[in-house]
């Protein structure tokens, strides 16, 4: 197979054709600054309002609760830092988990250095938060719970509705990083008692460099970027109009196609998982076997290095990942895989495959055969595997 097979859609996605078409006029024709008073620019202000409404509808929110940002990392930083600053007179304790994206973990570490206390919850072997652990971690000084909707590496979907209920019961703000979940699973902020939610355009066939933070009306969150009065004086800077158009168009498309698209993805994902587990010995599926994103499969292969597997897959035209794209250059094993209890040597042999609506069965079959061939080759070169075989033959 000579073409590239892209199975790293958790890292980023191809921008959909209709999204590109919707964006182009805002580069070439409707390029006015939305803050300007003349009618040429006011069209852009109206366009932003329309896309804000589209995104709000997708969440069951109000348009004035959607704030555009440069992406998921900014939204996460804003949610944690600005909440901590606004509510520091009420308390200084934040609860999150050990499997969050680094945009949350590193922000939490920053806050710890600035006088806040952070509890990092353990998860079970499937990456699921234990609700009793969350209850036990709550203190009188707890001001924020931040737990991701679905994990970017192993695909586990957290019990968000139950977490939201616990937060509401104790009068604590609840933020969720929904960068991987938005557009892949239905989300309703009221049903789940979500006070803040982060999302990003490039994870749902939209452009890079655009995202949003949902902030429930009444939440006292401080401005994150100071300057002009954009985003209702909470996030200064001339709006990225083409990006906002792309984000809104991608959101509408994701909601419109969700049922058919995710059903197809889940069917192929299950086929991929079943064949790999059956045909590649000493392989483990990471993440919840059922409560997981429809396009995510994450495996650990014993006796091999994940980086070697990735390089050899790349030579066959297959794009995959050993974990988060934000940490793929690191030689350390995934913090997520360590958090679910995998030993270092097994965590090192991980592979994440994330499908798209364009992924075909023919491509999946080719990937499976390639994995079988490469894993066999790498194991035959492994002293650890050789020792294991000798011991089992005694």
Show where each model-derived region lies.
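Pyridoxal 5′-phosphate
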Residues: 1-394
């Amino acid at each position: 197979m000579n073409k590239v097979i892209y199975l790293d859609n958790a890292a980023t996605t191809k921008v959909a054709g209709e999204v590109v078409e919707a964006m182009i006029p805002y580069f070439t024709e409707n390029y006015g600054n939305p803050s300007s008073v003349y009618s040429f620019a006011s069209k852009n202000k109206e366009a932003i309002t329309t896309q804000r409404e589209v995104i709000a509808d997708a969440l069951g929110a109000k348009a004035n609760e959607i704030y555009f940002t440069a992406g998921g990392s900014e939204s996460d930083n804003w949610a944690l830092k600005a909440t901590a600053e606004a509510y520091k007179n009420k308390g200084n304790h934040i609860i999150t988990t050990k499997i969050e994206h680094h945009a949350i973990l590193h922000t939490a570490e920053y806050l710890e250095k600035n006088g806040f206390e952070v509890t990092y919850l353990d998860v079970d072997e499937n990456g699921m938060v234990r609700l009793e652990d969350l209850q036990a971690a709550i203190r009188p000084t707890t001001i924020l719970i931040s737990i991701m909707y679905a994990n970017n590496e192993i695909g586990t979907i957290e019990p968000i509705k139950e977490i939201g209920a616990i937060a509401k019961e104790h009068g604590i703000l609840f933020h969720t990083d929904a960068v991987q979940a938005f557009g892949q699973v239905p989300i309703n902020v009221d049903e789940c008692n979500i006070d803040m939610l982060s999302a990003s355009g490039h994870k749902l066939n939209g452009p890079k460099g655009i995202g949003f933070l949902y902030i429930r009306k009444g939440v006292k969150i401080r401005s994150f970027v100071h300057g002009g009065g954009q985003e209702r004086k909470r996030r200064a800077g001339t709006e990225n109009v083409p990006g906002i158009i792309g984000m809104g168009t991608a959101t509408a498309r994701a909601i419109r196609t969700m049922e058919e698209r995710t059903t197809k993805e889940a069917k192929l994902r299950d086929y991929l998982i079943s064949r790999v587990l059956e045909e590649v010995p000493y392989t483990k599926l990471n993440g919840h076997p059922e409560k997981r994103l429809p396009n995510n499969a994450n495996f650990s292969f014993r006796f091999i290095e994940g980086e070697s597997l990735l390089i050899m897959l790349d030579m066959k035209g297959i794009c995959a990942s050993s974990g988060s794209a934000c940490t793929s250059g690191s030689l350390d094993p995934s913090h997520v895989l360590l958090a679910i209890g995998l030993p270092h040597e097994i965590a090192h042999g991980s592979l994440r495959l994330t499908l798209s609506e364009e992924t075909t069965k023919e491509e999946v079959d080719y990937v499976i055969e390639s994995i079988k061939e490469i894993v066999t080759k790498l194991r035959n070169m492994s002293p650890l595997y050789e020792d294991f075989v000798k011991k089992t033959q005694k």
